[in-house]
Amino acid sequence: MNEDLPKEYFELIRKALNEKEAEKAPLSRRRRVRRKNQPLPDAKKKFKTGLNELPRESVVTVNLDSSDDGVVTVPTDDSVEEIQSSEEDYDSEEFEDVTDGNEVAGVEDISVEIKPSSKRNSDARRTSRNVCSNEERKRRKYFHMLYLVCLMVHGFIRNEWINSKRLSRKLSNLVPEKVFELLHPQKDEELPLRSTRKLLDGLKKCMELWQKHWKITKKYDNVGLYMRTWKEIEMSANNKRKFKTLKRSDFLRAVSKGHGDPDISVQGFVAMLRACNVNARLIMSCQPPDFTNMKIDTSLNGNNAYKDMVKYPIFWCEVWDKFSKKWITVDPVNLKTIEQVRLHSKLAPKGVACCERNMLRYVIAYDRKYGCRDVTRRYAQWMNSKVRKRRITKDDFGEKWFRKVITALHHRKRTKIDDYEDQYFFQRDESEGIPDSVQDLKNHPYYVLEQDIKQTQIVKPGCKECGYLKVHGKVGKVLKVYAKRDIADLKSARQWYMNGRILKTGSRCKKVIKRTVGRPKGEAEEEDERLYSFEDTELYIPPLASASGEITKNTFGNIEVFAPTMIPGNCCLVENPVAIKAARFLGVEFAPAVTSFKFERGSTVKPVLSGIVVAKWLREAIETAIDGIEFIQEDDNRKEHLLGALESWNTLLLKLRIRSKLNSTYGKIAEEEPNVTKEQNIADNHDNTETFMGGGFLPGIANHEARPYSEPSEPEDSLDYVSVDKAEESATDDDVGEDYSDFMKELEMSEESD
């Protein structure tokens, strides 16, 4: 090595070599320090016991619920002290000796068991377990609809009962002449409010008279018509006790005598007003179970008292004021109040305890002419933002269904009173205003947040926001609110064509969006798609058919009919599966009609040909040909079914012939009779419930006792209910063949006659 190098270089090289050797050397463990009083173990004794005994397994339990992080307890037989690390340990000269490979045999097996924390996810598990499944949600929704129909029909029946003429004659005697005059005041031309005031005084007098006449002698059975929880409904389904139904005669007797529960009392009060020729209608607040409650455990608290439940009524009354053109609300039993509802009604339930059993969602009105109307808008202050979300009418399917139910129960023509009431409901919708929370603005029928405007929507030109919403908890954050009438829907040119409209000449797109093209993964690409508004389109008018009936077709040889306006003016659409076959049979001009598209797996799209487009003067001929083709198809199906039945009969007769021949030639094989006790009991049970007519290949006798089939004891093969005389018993194989040939001849003759 060069001696000219300074000493510092040699020291650096020596230090680097020492560090490499230290890295290659095996790591040594620190010596375990034992207690002073504990004697050293005998090496020989330990070696002997190690050969005779298997190593014991040590268990290490790690509990994640423990608050001491990083501390693990290892229970072993040897007591070992844990030495805290300090600077003195590094200065100590005592090191642990490296164990040889032969000493590894004494090492014990250690199994580590980790227990997950149960407290950490306990709350999350409770919430996840208390949410019902999708199937349960559907079941609750349809049960809610069924329950609602039953309640509405119940109110309709009670409204029919209180129109009894016999009951009206009895109740009219309760009202004196002075009160009757107050119920029918003359119109005050100077101040119509005076006439309304007299009507209100007459209603107040009627309430006082009815309170003297009626005595509430009975409480509600369980919860009555108030809302039940899902758990209570399941328990009542398992309960098989019979409920006593109230008959019409019992109802009329209770109203005449003035004894019963509060619901019958209100219904009797409406009957008394109708007996006085007052336009009064029965109001019912239907309380079906809440289908928006997604919890599995829907049990209520035990603190719910009977007084909280009956604080707000289920039934009340409305009287028409012909002077102010409004309905007056009357509650003669519970709250004993008379009001003209403006924004908030006194009959709307308030408080958590009252709303658990009485939730204002469906308020149905029944008038004296058997009319049925939904008047929930009058009593619900926040109808569109809060109440609507708990109704079945929150989506289009439920809205259509509810209208059908109302229409089925509405048995009168429309009057001017309905027009006044609809105008009042429209004013209430306008005066409800913008909700004060983001949650209430979700799916609102009249307002939408700026952040909820869809990609295919824009704000109409010249329209601005109608209000602002300040977000709670976020300083300075304000959201814009737009009216839905100021939002325009945009569609592409193809989408407008599917609706029977095409773009105007020179129209410009209102918006350009990115559309994903290509269904398979990895092949999706984005391309620009131009969107147009309704004002940029016009109605598509197809060309007319020629005098010979020829129709203009596209390149595929058909015509697209996605809307009724896409049919040529002198043509018609005939939708039938065999319409194309009928037109080809007649040899007339036609065009297959593509009315929709069918999407299959992947990106495959196939057109649906549901009929044809022909000239109007050929419609009758096409329909006649379709009827003939359908008749031929039905006749072919009938013949095919008949041939199948005849083949089955033929197979049965062949089997009987072969069996009879084998028995007559080789004799009958003895078989054990089956155990008929169990089958006889089953047949008796079926015979007790209903009787069956004979069917199948072998005709039976009506009301005949069912018996299991058993082999006859005679050498000949016969059936129990078929009488066989002695002449037939001596029949030979030739006789059987002649009978079969005669049967086949008759069969061929019947086919020729057909």
Swiss-Prot record:
It is found in: Cytoplasm; Nucleus. GO terms for biological process: DNA topological change; mismatch repair; negative regulation of transcription by RNA polymerase II; nucleotide-excision repair; nucleotide-excision repair, DNA damage recognition; proteasome-mediated ubiquitin-dependent protein catabolic process. CDD domains: sm_acid_XPC-like. Residues 730-741 have a biased composition (Acidic residues). Residues 250-269 bind DNA. InterPro entries: BHD_2, DNA_repair_Rad4, DNA_repair_Rad4-like, Papain-like_cys_pep_sf, Rad4/PNGase_transGLS-fold, Rad4_beta-hairpin_dom1, Rad4_beta-hairpin_dom3, Rad4_BHD3_sf. Keywords: Cytoplasm, DNA damage, DNA repair, DNA-binding, Nucleus. GO terms for molecular function: damaged DNA binding; single-strand break-containing DNA binding; single-stranded DNA binding. Residues 23-51, 701-754 are annotated as: Disordered. One of its GO terms (cellular component) is nucleus. It comes from the Eukaryota. Its main location: cytoplasm. Residues 27-37 have a biased composition (Basic residues). The keyword Nucleus applies. Present with 876 molecules/cell in log phase SD medium. Belongs to the XPC family. Involved in nucleotide excision repair of DNA damaged with UV light, bulky adducts, or cross-linking agents. This is DNA repair protein RAD4. The lineage of its organism: Eukaryota, Fungi, Dikarya, Ascomycota, Saccharomycotina.
